[in-house]
Amino acid sequence: MQQLNPSEISEIIKQRIEKSNVAAQARNEGTVVSVSDGIVRIYGLADVMYGEMIEFPGGIFGMALNLEQDSVGAVVLGNYLGLTEGMSAKCTGRILEVPVGPELLGRVVDALGNPIDGKGPINAQATDAVEKVAPGVIWRKSVDQPVQTGYKSVDAMIPVGRGQRELIIGDRQIGKTALAIDAIINQKNSGIRCVYVAIGQKQSTIANVVRKLEEHGALQNTIVVAASASESAALQYLAPYAGCTMGEYFRDRGEDALIVYDDLSKQAVAYRQISLLLRRPPGREAYPGDVFYLHSRLLERASRVSEEYVEKFTNGAVTGKTGSLTALPIIETQAGDVSAFVPTNVISITDGQIFLESAMFNAGIRPAVNAGISVSRVGGAAQTKIVKKLSGGIRTALAQYRELAAFAQFASDLDEATRKQLEHGQRVTELMKQKQYAPMSIADMSLSLYAAERGYLADVEVAKVGAFEQALIAFFNREFADLMARINVKGDFNDEIDAGLKAGIEKFKATQSW
């Protein structure tokens, strides 16, 4: 046998190394090291990217969320009970996508877009990424078209525009979902497509919402995305992004859409659970450091986009049309504490908030909208002209009434002006009450506001204000149908409409005693 000296040995090793193709070795396969609480640790997968889909045996998928030096932390989408240590895991090279398009309207789907309503498969023609970058500043347009919620208190004092993010915030069981559902019901003839995302709710509650939408003819215009309380934290975390992608389909094609997130507090809790299981360091209230980004990247996707954006997106197929996605996120507070971590985050991200107060709700004022701390930062420019003109004194009357009511408890005798202000405030408060599932048209709303603004309620008993309003609206829709139709179509306020409303109310009061 030939003897090799050390220099020859090193030369042979160098040649062998040069000939071997290390780069061609597979780096996109790994081994499951541990499985617990829906979190999988995988050794290997050197080429995996953040947010990439990982495939396990048996058609189970996960999503890579933690990329560490020698392992990957992934969250399993769906049932993880079939996964065991030692199983193989593969990179797919794809990010999570959900079906989009008009085929989803009228259906109930889970966070991955699979139908769960028993009505058969959905033959969607397209899919789109769940996580997308929001449109840039250059592609956006200012909010100047209204979204009518059908609630007097909201449309008059806290108007919502197309492309706005308006937060609905309040304690549990106070009417937050009811307000959002009524806003969806009111869009059935407006051309605005709706998406309702239920996060961490009871399945009975979701079924009730779907039934109510169907009863009022609004389900055919709505996509319901449901990640109920029994679903994994991963699906509750992903559901809002999936719903947003489905809504963006309409926005990007020059249509208008409305999305309700019910509610983002539960999404934050699900994300906190995932982050703690992934051993990320906890911060305030044990939430991870990026919980603000969790909501900001979601809510920034709601926007009004320009004609150029729509034209560029559709390759010239749609021209001269703007698109919008309006968001109504819901946040649940604990004992009215709006200064907690998640509520303050979402208040700072959104363009205003509708604050519902439990004291008002318990006093029978429903919707329990607190006009004092509720605000719409951009909706004023989008408000219908007639409603804007007639609602100017409503917020002031309510604010003054609340201040005087507190003061009047201590004062024994009040002067005439103060007494009149108090009585006017009581009547306006009564007028702002509205039943659930009874959204109002612009004309009906304008008539109520006109009666309050011009002092026609002054001689009506406080207890009879609601009945007076209903009788007045019924009278106008019967006797002055043309005027009401004109207000609904145009939404303008001029001397002719002013005179018509005045003459009609005077005729009503002359023929009926209140």
Curated annotation (Swiss-Prot):
Binding site for ATP: 170-177
SUPFAM superfamilies: C-terminal domain of alpha and beta subunits of F1 ATP synthase (SSF47917), N-terminal domain of alpha and beta subunits of F1 ATP synthase (SSF50615), P-loop containing nucleoside triphosphate hydrolases (SSF52540)
Family note: Belongs to the ATPase alpha/beta chains family.
Cysteines engaged in disulfide bonds, as pairs: none
Catalytic activity from the UniProt record: ATP + H2O + 4 H(+)(in) = ADP + phosphate + 5 H(+)(out)
Identification of the protein by name: ATP synthase subunit alpha
GO CC term, one of those recorded: plasma membrane
